[in-house]
């Protein structure tokens, strides 16, 4: 729908300045939809994400009433015909993990957008009413698929979320990892001044480096800067995955 002057808010995929709905992640996290959201009323990004995963054939046994999982039957038959039915759970788990990761990317990009009025997913649950849309972290019965815990999901979608703007994700050990830390806070109460602890860990949980930064008081309804982290990687001796943890 075209934005009109009478709109008190605007729910859309796109404004006159570009796309506000996000479907993708990027090689960095230092980006947002601020420019695209800068119009004369609050904008809400419509149907963000929509990451489709492989069906979970174990869900078929839940259909005990008048509705039959005919779409599941078609997909299962095709997989069996191609000799890959034994890989069905692997496909489901792998694509499900990718979906969870993509929702984290999408959600955080819009939380970094300080002038965004919000966002709405196509759904937390799969949508079976118009073909097959396996886009949810919950199945069509609103039950968990076992892909992510509620606590883990809330790390990137909650009233208060810590954010890190990273210019890139791949570094050499002669470089310095940098991240601008921010907080999205729409909780009920302001946050007092304090300290934010950060820790860079390897895949085995060993600490590469840790420290803390002093944080200012944070009012409600804001996206605020907390400070910057600079970590020399000269002690990293081989290629590996490192994760930044904050508390």
Q: Could you say what each language-model-derived stretch is?
A:
Residues 62-67, 138-142, 182, 199-202, ...:
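Short, low-complexity, polar/charged sequence segments that are solvent-exposed and flexible
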Residues 1-138:
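Substrate-binding/catalytic cleft of secreted carbohydrate-active enzymes
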Residues 175-216, 225-232, 240-247:
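Beta-strand-rich binding/interaction modules
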Residues 97-104, 113, 147, 171, ...:
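Conserved structured core elements
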Residues 73-86, 150-158, 212-214:
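Short C-terminal domain-edge/linker segments immediately following a structured domain
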Residues 122-187, 196:
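Aromatic-rich peripheral "rim/lid" segments of glycoside hydrolase catalytic domains that contact
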């Amino acid at each position: 729908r075209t934005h009109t002057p009478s709109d008190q808010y605007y729910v859309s995929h796109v404004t006159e300045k570009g796309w506000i709905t996000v479907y993708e992640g990027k090689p960095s996290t230092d980006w947002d939809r601020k420019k695209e959201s800068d119009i004369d009323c609050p904008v809400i990004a419509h149907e963000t994400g929509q990451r489709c995963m492989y069906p979970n054939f174990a869900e078929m046994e839940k259909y005990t009433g008048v509705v039959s999982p005919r779409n599941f039957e078609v997909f299962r038959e095709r997989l069996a015909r191609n000799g890959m039915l034994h890989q069905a759970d692997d496909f489901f788990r792998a694509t499900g993990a990718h979906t969870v990761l993509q929702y984290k990317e999408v959600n955080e990009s819009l939380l970094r957008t300080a002038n965004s009025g919000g966002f709405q997913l196509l759904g937390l649950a799969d949508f079976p009413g118009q073909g097959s849309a396996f886009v949810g972290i919950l199945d069509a019965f609103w039950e968990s698929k076992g892909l992510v815990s509620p606590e883990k999901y809330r790390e990137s979608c909650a009233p208060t979320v810590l954010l890190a703007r990273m210019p890139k994700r791949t570094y050499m050990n002669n470089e310095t990892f940098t991240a601008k830390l921010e907080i999205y806070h729409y909780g009920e109460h302001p946050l007092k001044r304090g300290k934010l602890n950060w820790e860079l860990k390897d895949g085995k949980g060993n600490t590469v480096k840790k420290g803390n930064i002093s944080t200012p008081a944070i009012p409600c309804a804001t996206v605020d800067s907390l400070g910057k982290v600079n970590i020399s990687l000269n002690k990293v001796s081989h290629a590996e995955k490192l994760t930044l943890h904050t508390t």
